[in-house]
């Protein structure tokens, strides 16, 4: 018997043990016939000259099986063959950065016990007046086969060896109708009929499952190539679907995982992309392309530590562009940390914006840092907008290993900021849920624990205050809301609720004050504006009431109650203006320069305010615009101005030693004198004597 031909085996699995496992697992899913039905009508002869095979060429491959004992045996694989398999399976030719290469070829390996009995080498199949070589041959592109015929005087030839099952004869012309699919000689204990030759889909399979799918027309390398084409065209969803199908066939291929990560990145599903890259690195720790993708993803997520780990991993020359981005990100994060420690929130906003502009455009923690800065600056609406812009990653995504920002796990930090913003806007139930989740993620961090405790106390105080208000116990409700404000001194909801209590108690000044606190952080807070406008009406400050109602009318164009309140306030204001004119009020500050005019002004009925000022004094110049505002705000009050430099005799008669000085008279009697008062104190004094 002649030499046994050893042909190359296509790389098809990640490991020999993997093939044993997969073939055994999927064997029951495949219906493999024990033999092929053949027509017995072909006249052949066993007389075939040995020299007749000298001109044989490559032919279409046919299924070859060994003796019946070969199916039950467990042939061993040499160490050299295992090495060739391992080398082949580490190839990542399917990477997006380099277009798909040709498919590896598939040929048969004849193991011991599977040698042909022909001493001439390649057996021949006779068809009509020609005979054909049955040797499998693949083109360099990994697929094609051909057949070359030679004329022979012999008309009845039976090929040597065991091409046909025992007792069966090939039908004339059968070789030309044989399937063009390539064959793979497999190992293992699975039942594949006679021998271990099974059909292959052209190469690229990695397991028994891959062989099965290939029979249905699916090929992982072809799917990868199609996915790459879709990716280049910008059809990322279609590319992702194709990569998914390739991974289903070959889950142990790192290149497929990396390509899937690229498609997910293009779809802005960064959390899932990170997980795919991590899986690719787990499969092949030396896969540099996956490390590079991971570094780029971590830079976009603002995770500098993880990015550095993959940019500078052992055996890889760092990409200078990524390295520069990493260093810039680290610089901005460091400056942001320093600004937060000293409460320089404007600098913190500036540094987070710079880090995002540098490429960390999908970092939840950086956007949360900006939201925290706005929250501390009492700009609640801006903070809420930032929270709404926080990138939504896969809810199963967690940085691996965990990354911290400001000493907190980044996921816990983001949840803490969201909880505080929710609490400031009255979304108390959401605040509790997020604070509890943050505490679960970072149980030992004191700042996270403090946020959770504060949220719970504020929610408890608000609930207690609402219950007391509903039962008509307004004074006790004020105390309950005040307890909540001790924990969160900028909570606009608690201020607004307490303002409602003050209104019910008839303390309209306090109601206006609490509404002002609420509107300081939320300028468009509708409830606070409604309550302040109503309080202004009770105080007779109709001009201020009209301003609030006009704003509410623009915000609530379909609200009939707001429209009625606005008309009523305007009517009252007009009537008051006409009344003031009839009584001699002119709604502007009047200058007084002589002692006689001063005495006449003091004798006017009602409240009169005299402002002694100097044109060269800075404080006088600062408070003068406010006096003009008060003149319009309180039309039933007389406002006068005395320039001490121009009326020195009057200033001396009134003993004016420092400016600005204010003197108040009611019905001709002096009731109060103030030197350099604050705006609030001056207005409070006017309101006190006006009522």
From Swiss-Prot:
Keywords: Phosphoprotein, Repeat, Stress response, TPR repeat
Induction summary: By salt treatment in cotyledons and cold stress in pollen. Repressed by auxin (e.g. IAA).
Composition-biased stretches (Low complexity): 51-79
Segments for region (Disordered): 1-153, 174-209
TPR repeats: 220-253, 255-287, 289-321, 327-362, 412-445, 458-491, 492-525, 527-559
Residue ranges of the TM segments: none
Pfam families from the UniProt entry: Thioredoxin, TPR_16
UniProt biased composition (Basic and acidic residues): 19-39, 83-93
Cited SUPFAM superfamilies: Thioredoxin-like, TPR-like
Inactivation phenotype: Altered vein pattern in cotyledons and primary leaves. Mutant seedlings show increased sensitivity to osmotic and salt stresses in roots.
GO CC terms: cytosol; plasma membrane
PANTHER family: INACTIVE TPR REPEAT-CONTAINING THIOREDOXIN TTL3, TPR REPEAT-CONTAINING THIOREDOXIN
Subunit and interaction comment: Interacts with BRL2.
Purpose: Involved in osmotic and salt stress tolerance. May play a role in the control of meristematic cell size during osmotic stress. May function as an adapter protein for BRL2 and may be required for signaling affecting leaf vascular tissue pattern formation.
Protein name per its UniProtKB record: Inactive TPR repeat-containing thioredoxin TTL3
